[in-house]
Every structure is written in C-alpha cells, then in structure tokens.
Swiss-Prot record:
It catalyses: Hydrolysis of proteins to small peptides in the presence of ATP and magnesium. alpha-casein is the usual test substrate. In the absence of ATP, only oligopeptides shorter than five residues are hydrolyzed (such as succinyl-Leu-Tyr-|-NHMec, and Leu-Tyr-Leu-|-Tyr-Trp, in which cleavage of the -Tyr-|-Leu- and -Tyr-|-Trp bonds also occurs). NCBIfam families: PRK00277.1, PRK12553.1. It comes from Caulobacter sp. (strain K31). GO terms for biological process: protein quality control for misfolded or incompletely synthesized proteins. Pfam families: CLP_protease (PF00574). Its EC number is 3.4.21.92. Cleaves peptides in various proteins in a process that requires ATP hydrolysis. Has a chymotrypsin-like activity. Plays a major role in the degradation of misfolded proteins. SUPFAM superfamilies: ClpP/crotonase (SSF52096). The keyword Lipid biosynthesis does not apply. The keyword Zinc does not apply. This is ATP-dependent Clp protease proteolytic subunit. One of its GO terms (molecular function) is ATPase binding.
Length: 208
C-alpha cells in the first residue's frame, strides 16, 4: 500500500557542513535538531512518541535552560502515545515552545497548547481541531464495560489538561470537545490554545 509519509521520509534532503575535520553530511531533520528544533509531523503513535521523547531528553541534557522549538503538523493519533510526549514536555527543565503549521488536530492540539506559556504559536493559515477521545472494543460484556469506564476516565483527564493550559472552565472544555470542533488560528488564540499568531520570523523574534 502506498504510504505518502514513508515516501516523503525517503526523500529527506541531506545537508553538508564544513568542519575542522572535513565535510559532514546530516539529514535535514538532524541538522535542525542541532538548532534545538523538533518536528512532530504525521499521526501520533508509539514509534513517533519514542523518537520525540528521546529528542526532548537529549536536548535537555545538552542545555536544560535553553528553549526547544517543536513544530507540529499532525492529525492526532493514539492517546497514550500523545500523553507520553505531553508528560515529557512537562517533565524536562528546558522550556518547549510549540508552533502549529498546517494542522494540529486531536492529540496534536493537546500538544500544541502544552507549550511554555507565552510561547505557543500558530502560523496564519494553521487549523486546530479539538474533540473527545474515541475508540472501539470487541469482547465479553464485562470487558467492554471496563473499557468504557477507562475511556471515560481518559476523557476526563484530557479535559483537565485543556483546562490547565487554556484557562477555560471544565464545563466549557467539555462542551467544546463534545464533537469535532475546528478553529482558525484567531479562534484558537481566543480560546486559549495558543498565545501568538506569527506571519514572519521577524515578528516571532520581536515577541521572543
């Protein structure tokens, strides 16, 4: 089956740098990692979460006081994988700024609003979508009941995280997340998911 994400990753360009020891070649994402820039793109799943968490922990070990920039373009994905990234963002000492380019939906929106206060950014044409968790399970009635109880607990926990970072009341969050709720960058700012909408690098530097 054709996988556009895999195809794109196979076309990642290389960057050649001159050093005192000669030339060194980096893929573009590794080169940006040297500048403390992380890309969270595509569906949020366990493999991606491991890579993102490892990058966050590595950059913290390099300089715990220096900011890390996380660029997000994601349709969301697995809740547990997203919460692993969220917890690591909160756990490390380095402040993490978040930038939405394209789309931050579902778990992507939760990670966007989890950036350091004052450093949550969207580009002008970014779209943000929030909603409650979804899932499915087949099995014995008692097992289905337990899974239903667990997803309700998960829903409550995710709502509490949105409350913490947006300043909205629990009731407001629960009502907004009841169905797929799409927002423009301006609407996301008004709702408290982001702090700034930046059209240019100069504008971002002025607000830094």
């Amino acid at each position: 089956m054709y996988d556009p994400m895999a195809t794109a990753m196979n076309l990642v360009p290389m960057v050649v740098e001159q050093t005192s020891r000669g030339e060194r070649a980096f893929d573009i994402f590794s080169r940006l990692l040297k500048e403390r820039i992380i890309f969270l793109t595509g569906p949020v799943e366990d493999g991606m979460a491991s890579l993102i968490c490892a990058q966050l922990l590595f950059l913290e070990s390099e300089n715990p006081k220096k900011e890390i920039a996380m660029y997000i373009n994601s349709p969301g994905g697995v809740v547990t994988a997203g919460l692993a990234i969220y917890d690591t963002m909160q756990y490390i000492k380095s402040p993490v700024s978040t930038v939405c380019m394209g789309m931050a939906a579902s778990m992507g929106s939760l990670l966007l609003q989890a950036g350091a206060p004052g450093h949550r950014i969207a580009l002008p044409n970014a779209r943000i979508m929030v909603h409650q968790p979804s899932g499915g399970f087949r099995g014995q009635a008692s097992d289905i009941e337990r899974h239903a109880e667990d997803i309700i607990k998960t829903k409550r926990r995710l709502n509490e995280i949105y409350v913490k970072h947006t300043g909205r009341t629990y009731e407001e969050v629960e009502k907004t997340l009841d169905r797929d709720h799409f927002m423009s960058a301006e609407e996301a700012k008004a709702w408290g998911l982001i702090d700034h909408i930046n059209e240019s690098r100069d504008e971002a530097d002025e607000k830094a």
